[in-house]
């Protein structure tokens, strides 16, 4: 199965790109087109490590393929450097939506950290408005091209700063203006969700949806804190939940597992796992199990009934698309179209939308896979 970032792949004779998809874990600053980075940097006089788009892509790859989350995150200094003005944010957001639509995404949630985009003099509110303007322009452009897509914002607070309560209030203020949820991200080690209890208390009081990056670089304690302190409705990555499972026997496709209390809670409550297999490989998130895609516990979690979803994390950093991620999983674990559909249904059910709109997404996915 030929797989590339922007191309297509076929499964059982069907174009994967043509199928309706839901994208829940998609970073705006991880998805800026390299040629856009180069152009915006040139216009703004921003110094880049490489000025040619292809060379810049290679430079980013060197950092993101390191096997360490901390090194992986350094590439974001480049993308955020050209996301500091209203015009820059609007363009990047518009192109992001266009790229999702081209990828066959019908509903997406884009996460980004407003506190990292104030260098051009914008207020937090102005930054959110700029991104929303770009999203709406992208949705309109996609509709003109015959592709219907809806995208909501997830406002991210950085776990190593003290701005989480401020960002939480910002998210709630914009809940009727394009923002659908709150996220906590950044280096996990040393910065547990418990440091941000005031923000999470406020969000709980406001009945506002929360997802938390957890179980990526850190272990099950980070997931425990995301659930207990963050009251997360979804887990950003969450792959380390598999460390709370003990495989006691295997026979063919059958596996016998002993569940820890945390893993059983996540599975039984159908808490969506926002898994991103390419990114997890790049950052070393699957190191406890190995270094190859086939070592990823995705399939184990899926077979055990966890609410697994498939995501890109960072399109530019991982040089990927949702089509590509699905193709990789299908090739690695011998999945068929029924499995691909299940991943989309899990994502639709976990979207930060009213139940009626989630049901509409489920119907769109079901109809799109009725081939």
Q: Where is each model-derived feature located?
A:
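Metal-cofactor-binding active-site regions of metalloenzymes
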Residues: 1-208, 216-234, 240-371
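Short HxH-centered metal-ligating active-site micro-motif
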Residues: 213
């Amino acid at each position: 199965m030929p797989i590339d970032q922007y191309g297509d792949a076929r499964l059982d004779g069907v174009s994967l790109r043509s199928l309706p998809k839901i994208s829940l874990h998609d970073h705006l600053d991880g998805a800026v087109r390299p040629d856009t980075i180069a152009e915006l940097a040139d216009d703004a006089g921003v110094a880049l490590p490489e000025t040619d788009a292809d060379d810049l892509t290679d430079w980013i790859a060197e950092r993101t393929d390191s096997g360490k989350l901390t090194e992986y995150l350094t590439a974001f200094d480049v993308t955020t450097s050209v996301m500091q003005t209203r015009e820059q944010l609007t363009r990047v957001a518009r192109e992001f939506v266009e790229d999702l639509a081209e990828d066959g995404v019908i509903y997406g949630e884009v996460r980004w950290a407003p506190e990292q985009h104030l260098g051009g003099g914008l207020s937090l509110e102005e930054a959110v408005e700029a991104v929303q303007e770009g999203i709406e322009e992208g949705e309109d452009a996609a509709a003109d091209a015959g592709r219907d897509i809806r995208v909501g914002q997830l406002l991210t607070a950085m776990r190593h700063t003290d701005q989480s309560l401020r960002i939480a209030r910002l998210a709630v203020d914009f809940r009727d203006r394009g923002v659908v949820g709150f996220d906590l991200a950044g280096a996990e080690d040393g910065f547990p969700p418990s440091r941000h209890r005031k923000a999470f208390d406020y969000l709980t009081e406001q009945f506002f949806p929360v997802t938390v990056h957890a179980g990526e670089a850190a272990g099950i304690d980070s997931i425990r804190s995301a659930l207990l302190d963050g009251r997360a409705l979804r887990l950003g990555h969450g792959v380390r939940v598999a460390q709370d499972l003990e495989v006691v026997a295997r026979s063919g496709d059958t596996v016998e597992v002993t569940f820890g209390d945390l893993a059983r809670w996540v599975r039984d409550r159908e808490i969506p796992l926002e898994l991103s297999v390419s990114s997890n490989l790049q950052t070393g998130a699957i190191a406890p199990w190995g270094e190859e895609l086939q070592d990823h516990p995705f399939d184990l979690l899926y077979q055990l009934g966890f609410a697994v979803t498939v995501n890109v994390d960072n399109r530019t950093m991982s040089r990927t698309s949702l089509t590509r991620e699905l193709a990789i999983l299908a090739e690695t674990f011998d999945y068929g179209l029924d499995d691909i559909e299940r991943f989309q249904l899990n994502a639709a059910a976990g979207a930060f939308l009213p139940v009626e709109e989630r049901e509409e997404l489920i119907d769109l996915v079901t109809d799109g896979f009725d081939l």
